[in-house]
A protein has these predicted regions:
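N-terminal intrinsically disordered, cationic/polar leader segments
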Residues: 1-121
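Expand to "…catalyze enediolate/carbanion chemistry for C-C bond making/breaking, isomerization
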Residues: 91-96, 100-410
Length: 410
């Protein structure tokens, strides 16, 4: 009898740990969980659980086969628990699972790209920007239907640290495949240096604007601008990508003007009040007295630099009356828009930032008086008992242009 045990084959000796990505469960929609167990032989074996399997099971399997093949996976057991995920989500989750296994590096599995919208104008209207968690694909598809001026696919605070890598791929694929209608397509990257890795995946898909969080010094803006330029050069892209810096600390506020002038690509400054008040060690209130200095610093720096000043989000999504008061005050201070955490906030913000009937009527009278004086060759323009100087005329022109852009007047 042979005293030596049988020799195991190489494939029997090697064990590969499983890798996962995505979510499933009764409260999950438009997502899936993927579990991949690599093996040395046997091809691709897919076990699929889905409520829509009778209708889309074969197409899901074909897509999984294609994605895995492009990523170089030839032999694996793949377990998919689907909760109604769209193809771009399925592809992103599979790619994330493969990358978490340490494979597929350098390979980007890209879904078919929809036609890019017209490039965003530097001075376009930015009254509202709706934040959408980058790890929650269920919010992507309908995000544009609520009428915000911009949709922010967020990779920062709304994404758990363990999901940053997977969210990056979801957002990348969403930029390629989701029609965001007339919304400006924005992405909030992570705080540097992690945010630079976000740009490597995001920039090739041509977002309109990148929000840079927790900016404290101009060098951070310049680092983002440099990485964007490098990626655009690598992919031969010429489409503009604008920047919006978020100031969220006492240091950032004190450096507001230098940050606003750090790059020609910056179109707006905004403020993050949750982090700012935490930095001060004070409680954020609905009146905002504790942050008035910071907001005015942002306003003054933005206007001095010739860019837009955008206010923070209003955190209490259930108190619409308080939101209305905040937004009205925000416009009165000189802000041109603010952030939104929930779609119900959008119409209230738009209403607050729209010129009122009285403002429009007064602007018309000012412009009429100015035009009449010009026709008569008069150097002095007056309306009633008040003199009208060039700044007043310019303000009236801007108000009427804004009213026309908002559809308030023809």
């Amino acid at each position: 009898m042979n005293a030596y045990p049988a020799t195991k084959t190489l494939s029997e000796e090697i064990e590969h740990p499983a890798s996962e990505a995505g979510r499933c469960g009764p409260d999950v929609r438009s997502d899936l969980r993927v579990r991949i167990e690599r093996r040395e032989h046997g091809g691709i074996e897919i076990e699929l659980h889905s409520r829509v399997e009778p209708y889309y099971g074969e197409s899901i399997r074909r897509l999984a086969d294609t994605v895995l093949e492009e990523l170089g996976i030839r032999h694996a057991r793949v377990h998919i628990e689907d909760e109604g995920a769209l193809p771009f989500v399925i592809s992103a989750r599979l790619e994330a699972a493969v990358r978490r296994a340490g494979l597929g590096k350098g390979t980007r599995v890209l879904p078919e790209q929809v036609e890019l919208p017209e490039a965003s104008a530097r001075d376009r209207m930015r009254r509202s920007r709706l934040y959408v968690p980058g790890s929650e694909p269920k919010y992507f598809i309908n995000a544009a239907l609520y009428g915000a001026d911009g949709v922010i696919l967020d990779l920062e605070d709304s994404v758990h640290p363990s999901e940053k890598d997977a969210a990056r791929l979801l957002v990348r694929n969403a930029l390629r495949t989701v029609d965001f209608l007339a919304c400006e397509r924005m992405v909030r990257i992570n705080q540097l240096p992690l945010g630079l890795e976000d740009l490597d995946e995001i920039v090739p898909e041509c977002p309109d604007l990148i929000l840079i969080p927790k900016v404290e010094i101009p060098d951070q803006v310049m680092a983002v601008e440099k990485r964007i330029a490098e990626v655009k050069s690598e992919y031969g892209l010429t489409r503009p990508i604008w920047l919006m810096s978020i100031l969220e600390s006492a240091l950032g506020i004190e450096n507001a003007f230098a940050i606003a002038r750090a790059s020609e690509k910056i179109v707006a400054l905004t403020i993050g009040l949750e982090d700012y008040t935490a930095d001060l060690g004070v409680v954020k209130t609905s009146t905002g007295t504790e942050s008035l200095y910071a907001r005015q610093q942002v306003l003054n720096a933005a206007h001095a630099a010739g860019i837009q000043a955008i206010d923070s989000v209003f955190g209490d999504v259930g108190d619409l009356d308080a939101l209305r008061a905040w937004a009205t005050n925000s416009r009165g201070l000189g802000f041109e828009g603010m952030g939104c955490l929930h779609p119900t906030q959008i119409p209230i913000i738009h209403q607050a930032f729209a010129p009122t009937a009285n403002e429009i009527e007064r602007a018309r009278k000012i412009l009429a008086a100015y035009n009449e004086a010009q026709e008569k060759g008069l150097a002095v323009v007056s309306l009633g008992s008040k003199m009208i100087d060039p700044p007043v005329v310019n303000r009236a022109l801007k108000l009427m242009a804004r009213a026309q852009a908002m559809g308030v007047v023809q």
